[in-house]
């Protein structure tokens, strides 16, 4: 669910960066809620959510819905080295393989792979503009119950929206905010095994507390 300023924000970004090949997408969901180290209206990042986004035809034309890059030996060598060197999610390439084997097109992996293979960045608003209302047992990407979801993940689905102020304040340089990436990875326990263990334990205890035994043995 977007707030009202999401639409004029996307329109201005689409116009401003229409021909800038460095930029591949405009995000709306900011896991910081309000990014503490950003004095501008938005910043640039290599990590993003597809919960509310906009892009251009030039970007979509580069997508490989059949995951052809997985069959390109040189591209995979480059991609594996990039993921390792920049500390991206270790499960990214296995996730792409799983998605390819499913026979379905998953936008999150197709989009992110395209961005990495083309050295692109996403525009992230400094304030969260999107609510995700899709946490339930029938959800496509995050199935479960709100009450048995660990607190850090529950926060993501209950996060407030904040309107952006106009006119927008544009950043002077196109450079990635790597601190945002580190915070997002910590929140999601990517590359943080101890945090992941604690979240799994929290989920186990919540399932026991609410008698959701099917969630324990799934």
Q: What are these language model-derived features?
A:
Residues 2-218:
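An acidic/histidine-cluster motif and surrounding catalytic segment
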